[in-house]
Amino acid sequence: MAKRSLSSLSAEELCGKRVFVRVDFNVPVNAEGDITDDTRIRAALPTIKDLIDKGARVILSAHFGRPKGQVNDAMRLTPVAQRLSELLGHTVIKTDSCIGSDAQAKAQSLNNGDVMLLENVRFIQGEEKNDPDFAKELSELAEVYVNDAFGAAHRAHASTEGVTKFLSPNVAGYLMEKELQYLQGAIDSPKRPLAAIVGGSKVSSKIGVLESLIDKCDKVLIGGGMIFTFYKARGLSVGKSLVEDDKLELAKALEEKAKSKGVELLLPTDVVLADNFSPDANSQIAQINSIPEGWMGLDIGPDSVKLFQDALEDCQTVIWNGPMGVFEFDKFANGTNSIATTLSVLSQKGCCTIIGGGDSVAAVEKAGLADKMSHISTGGGASLELLEGKTLPGVAALDELD
């Protein structure tokens, strides 16, 4: 079901109202505590700026790291408040806690257009337990709820789900709306042919996604370390490559399922091998039926890149989740970079290209092609669960579109 969005609320409905906005500000920081990538902060700006323009009193809630219900000074949101202040061009008010007298007093004293950032919501144990008393206390800060934290939407926590029971309306922010539009749209009503490229090292972490995508897609292309589990299941020798021996039957079953549904399931035909797992390992290219003992596959080979490019050529929608190899090592990044380049070209031709979270986002950004894709998801686990066809609690809690 489609969810109600912030765009449905007018300035008249929001002016002077305190609006609780759950955002995803779980940004990477270096040893000094400086933010190394502010993408997630910038992704929330359209929602925050719209609320400011409509005269709302904006109360932002976010988590950072895994403090496990304890106050941890290294996980305070102070650097985030500073960066957000710079991006907005005016001071963001920061609280010492997400509940209690300081938060209440600052919320009550907000003026129209002010922005306040609550301290790390995971400092309170009730957040991850979805404690109704804690959710109620959060709700008392505001009158309207907006969820713009797609990256946390797969968690039924107090700030993503529990709080909606005490506030109304509960709507999606613009980032959440865009994520659902692209990811849900690709699953429910894609322009076809629809292809999925699934990579990563383990079949076990992508079982649900592969099961679901084989049901929905016209083509499924598999790369990354998980290919060796499929090869071993076919009876091929894989040398020292990563294999999940307890998933061999599953790999066979997935190939059978694709065959029975008439879905084109493509695996690489050649691989780039290394004699050890390091950036400066010796390397060679081998066909999949002639991988020598003592070598491990760390990337898809050039023939496979061509095979995948040809398969994608006529596609109208492509979802990519997971790299083709160990792209962090330059010697073994060609497969991943080639797929990124291919998708950027397809995008320019009108194909809808969706980078579905996690390492594939990092790969596209490393290749400098992020701005060439139709949509880059901000959710890791949330993207996977949505592609698996699961209900996301943070989305389910929002008001239905009339």
Swiss-Prot record:
State where ATP binds.
206, 297, 328, 357-360
Identify the metabolic or biological route this protein is part of: Carbohydrate degradation; glycolysis; pyruvate from D-glyceraldehyde 3-phosphate: step 2/5
**Single GO molecular-function term?**
ADP binding
InterPro entries reported in the protein's UniProt record: Phosphoglycerate_kinase, Phosphoglycerate_kinase_CS, Phosphoglycerate_kinase_N, Phosphoglycerate_kinase_sf
Q: Which reaction does it catalyse?
A: (2R)-3-phosphoglycerate + ATP = (2R)-3-phospho-glyceroyl phosphate + ADP
Biological process terms in GO annotation? gluconeogenesis; glycolytic process
Instruction: Give the subcellular location.
Output: Cytoplasm
Please provide one cellular component term from the Gene Ontology annotations of this protein: cytosol
Family membership, please give it: Belongs to the phosphoglycerate kinase family.
Q: How does it assemble?
A: Monomer.
Q: PANTHER family this protein is in? A: PHOSPHOGLYCERATE KINASE (PTHR11406), PHOSPHOGLYCERATE KINASE 1, CHLOROPLASTIC-RELATED (PTHR11406:SF23)
Name used for this protein in its record: Phosphoglycerate kinase
- What organism does this protein naturally occur in? Prochlorococcus marinus (strain MIT 9211)
Organism phylogeny? Bacteria, Bacillati, Cyanobacteriota, Cyanophyceae, Synechococcales
